[in-house]
């Protein structure tokens, strides 16, 4: 019988939950507002309500996987310091949910970028590769490493933080405090600011009309829409972003000798407006011996990979520990 798990993507604005089949992927899904400003207790109440909803009528669910921002301990039970989640200094999610659920269930927590990478590896475009680097472009820049179809976590579980890798030691500071980190260029807020400066004197750009003459309202989504309509200014901004991404990925490839790269997250919807520049830049920043087989692809499953990966985390854990669910 095909195993099922509940996969949860805990985002800053939305909690997305799905019932995941090991063989076919997402069966059904639901989402509710996170309400992160209410603090961890209320947010965990909402997570528990989604778990309860999916367990009703699905007695064969073998566990719950949660992808969350912030630092995750090695045991995959505790979330510490997730950005934009007030009061989450260190929250033992496993214990908190156990006290809220009528029936105990295996619960695992993973960094959200790691969960997305695992989802891509088993249900998305990443299934073509046994090893790849995952980059997620959204509010911030996330990263993960898949090595032989499993998450590579490093010595303490925090490997893969590509967003904190620097491309300019005297550059602008990212939220992490790292000067010139790639997130300081490609994070949503930073990219929008760069677009404002770049387009300020290009009065013929569609962006002025789309933002109703107030460039403070520019978003990455607007850039993509304008590029689709042929706006050269928007295309230039997205190509600039792709160039920066290619620079940092060159360092990652040189370090890891992993030559396949999957790009996901909301900004990845801009597709080749970003990725063409990434590919053409990347080749110039990778040592010749590692240039063979380089490939940069867009994740086609969108934001579903977070839920899928969180669910698959459960299946992988059961297999690794030789556990047969009751």
Predicted regions: what is each one?
Residues 1-63, 72-78, 97-105, 119-130, ...:
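ATP-binding/phosphotransfer module of carbohydrate and carboxylate kinases, centering on a glycine-rich
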């Amino acid at each position: 019988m095909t195993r099922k798990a509940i996969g949860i993507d805990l985002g800053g604005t939305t909690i997305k939950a799905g019932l995941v089949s090991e063989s076919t992927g997402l069966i059904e899904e639901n989402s509710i507002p996170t309400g992160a400003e209410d603090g961890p207790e209320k947010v965990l109440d909402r997570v528990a309500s989604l778990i309860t909803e999916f367990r009703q009528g699905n007695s064969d669910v073998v566990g719950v996987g949660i992808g969350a921002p912030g630092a995750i301990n090695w045991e995959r039970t505790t979330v510490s310091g997730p950005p934009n989640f007030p009061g989450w200094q260190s929250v033992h999610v496993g214990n908190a949910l156990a006290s809220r659920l009528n029936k105990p269930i295996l619960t695992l927590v993973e960094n959200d970028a790691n969960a997305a990478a695992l989802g891509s590896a088993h249900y998305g475009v990443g299934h073509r590769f046994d090893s790849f680097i995952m980059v997620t472009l959204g509010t911030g820049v996330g990263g993960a490493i898949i090595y032989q179809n499993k998450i590579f976590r490093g010595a303490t579980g925090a490997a893969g933080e590509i967003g904190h890798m620097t491309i300019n030691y005297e550059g602008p500071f990212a939220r992490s405090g790292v000067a010139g980190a790639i997130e300081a260029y490609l994070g949503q807020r930073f990219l929008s600011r760069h677009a404002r400066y770049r387009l300020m004197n290009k009065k013929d750009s569609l962006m002025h009309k789309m933002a109703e003459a107030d460039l403070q309202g520019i978003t990455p989504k607007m850039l993509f829409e304008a590029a689709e309509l042929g706006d050269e200014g928007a295309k230039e901004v997205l190509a600039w972003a792709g160039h920066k991404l290619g620079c940092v990925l060159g360092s990652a490839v040189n370090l890891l000798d992993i030559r396949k790269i999957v790009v996901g997250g909301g900004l990845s919807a801009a597709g080749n407006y970003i990725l063409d520049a990434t590919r053409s830049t990347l080749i110039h920043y990778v040592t010749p011996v590692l240039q063979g087989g380089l490939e940069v692809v867009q994740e086609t499953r969108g934001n579903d990979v977070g839920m899928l990966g969180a669910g698959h985390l459960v299946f992988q854990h059961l297999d690794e520990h030789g556990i047969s669910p009751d």
